Amino acid sequence: MENLSERFNALQDLLMNIYEAAEQTLEAQIKHWQTLRQEAVLLYFARQRGVTRLGYQPVPVKAVSEAKAKEAIAMVLQLQSLQTSEYASETWTLVDTSIETFRSAPDGHFKKGPVPVEVIYDNDADNANLYTMWTYVYYMEDDVWHKARSGVNETGIYYLQGTFKYYYVLFADDARKYSQTGQWEVKVNKETVFAPVTSSTPPGSPGGQADTNASSKTSTTTTATVDSTTKQLTTSEQPQQTETKGRKYGRRPSSRTRRPQAKQRRSRSRHRSSRSRSRSQSRSHTPTTRSATTRSRSPSLAKTGVQRVSTRSRSRSTSRRGGRRRRSRSPSTSSSTTTTNKRSRVRAETTGSRGARGGRGARGGSGGGRRRGRSSSSTSPAHKRSREHSVRSRGVSPDQVGKSLRSVSSKHTGRLGRLLEEALDPPVILVRGEANTLKCFRNRAKIKYMGLYRSFSTTWSWVAGDGTERLGRPRMLISFSSYNQRRDFDDVVRYPKGVEKSYGNLDSL
């Protein structure tokens, strides 16, 4: 107990000397973090032995001491790596190397020169957020330290990685929470650097252009309203063109909404009804002759299905569905009841013969005949199931492996069928995190998990479609030979902290 107290007091004195000296060298910062590590280890050991107080200092629980010791070890490793770079001779203060500065955005980088950035939402001075822009950002790439400058624009705060802009603050994210109009104003050192911009069409995005004049900065909603008003004025200036189109593109106030298929049926029935009226008017002078002709022609129509009768029946049934039964009928049909009965008998016989044949003539019949014609030409579900069963029984050919782009369903498939369907999609895992973390994970996996994967990709990032800045965190792909291999890999491998993963499939590798 006394030895622990003496050792703890010695570490406290050493820390006080470091704080009083306030040296701005990298060696002094490494010594500071090594002392903090020793203090955390001592407190962990004391708590493990049941000691709850060292002098006037209460001993925290083991989890707290363990977390602080790990933080100190990580900072010592980072500072020792930075000591081997060309930036070791620069001035480094306790603030520059503190854990709070290291973990602030952008996380996992050393930073210097904080600059306050104020963002005002909706032109309301009380509705504002403060951000920190770092003048210099030190990051590691391919085990080499780089120094980059930060900048700010209407989109957010970024630092340059070569020619790419890496945004570590995006104003649009907070605008969704704090802004009602989606507009904000950016101020640096209380000076306005960007006038109010909108989140709907930010300058530089594919949907808008960055204008320098404040008068031309209008929202997308206003532009869309002006365009729609212009279209309405143009339409009202051309009433004849609207009346010519008729009910094809518009609808009467009293009519109900119809689907596009119903519009196509009406246009076809209007054309066929006009032909039917022209024929019926030419035959309206001799109803007795037409009745006799129908009587003598009906047996042959039931056997051969002449296209004339099918055309007349198609026009009547289509016009009856469209709600214009009186227009499609000829004026002479009401003159003879006997003729109407004969025509209905001929229509019934023709429909029966047409349904028995199942040919193209069935498409022009009544609604039921049309549905029967379509269902006969399509593949039944039983045929689909039998075809899929035959594919599963035959297996997957080598040229078909990796061709499917759909995810495999877990329903109605046995184990063999699922394995065969999974062979069509080479599985992958997409991991997201810091570039250095992903590279270390890849190097460690090559040693510890050899045989549990197929290959690793290099780290990569998405690039904006209208610029060269990188979007989001770096990514890396891990490919596998089978789904079982990916499952085994996922069960065994322990991913680093802060790394996210998602599953996917590729057409080919």
Curated annotation (Swiss-Prot):
The organism's place on the tree of life at top rank: Viruses
Region Transactivation domain: start-end pairs: 1-200
HAMAP family listed in its UniProt record: PPV_E2 (MF_04001)
A single MF term (Gene Ontology): nucleotide binding
Compartment(s): Host nucleus
Its biological purpose: Plays a role in the initiation of viral DNA replication. A dimer of E2 interacts with a dimer of E1 in order to improve specificity of E1 DNA binding activity. Once the complex recognizes and binds DNA at specific sites, the E2 dimer is removed from DNA. E2 also regulates viral transcription through binding to the E2RE response element (5'-ACCNNNNNNGGT-3') present in multiple copies in the regulatory regions of the viral genome. Activates or represses transcription depending on E2RE's position with regards to proximal promoter elements including the TATA-box.
Maturation and modification: Phosphorylated.
Gene Ontology biological process terms from the UniProt entry: DNA replication; DNA-templated transcription; regulation of DNA replication; viral DNA genome replication
Any GO CC annotation of this UniProt entry: host cell nucleus
Lineage: Viruses, Monodnaviria, Shotokuvirae, Cossaviricota, Papovaviricetes
Alphabetical list of Pfam families matching this protein: PPV_E2_C (PF00511), PPV_E2_N (PF00508)
UniProt biased composition (Polar residues): 232-243
Positions of the UniProt region annotated as Disordered: 197-413
Biased composition (Basic residues): 247-282, 311-329
InterPro entries to which the protein is assigned, alphabetical: E2/EBNA1_C_sf, Nucleotide-bd_a/b_plait_sf, Papillomavirus_E2_C, PPV_E2_N, Reg_prot_E2, Regulatory_protein_E2_N, Regulatory_protein_E2_N_1, Regulatory_protein_E2_N_2
Keywords, in A-Z order: Activator, DNA replication, DNA-binding, Early protein, Host nucleus, Phosphoprotein, Repressor, Transcription, Transcription regulation
UniProt feature, compositional bias: Gly residues: 355-368
Chain segments carrying region DNA-binding domain: 425-509
Protein name: Regulatory protein E2
Low complexity composition bias: residue spans: 211-231, 283-310, 330-341
Family note: Belongs to the papillomaviridae E2 protein family.
Quaternary assembly: Binds DNA as homodimer. Interacts with protein E1; this interaction greatly increases E1 DNA-binding activity. Interacts with protein L1; this interaction enhances E2-dependent replication and transcription activation. Interacts with protein L2; this interaction inhibits E2 transcriptional activity but not DNA replication function E2. Interacts with protein E7; this interaction inhibits E7 oncogenic activity. Interacts with host TAF1; this interaction modulates E2-dependent transcriptional regulation. Interacts with host BRD4; this interaction mediates E2 transcriptional activation function.
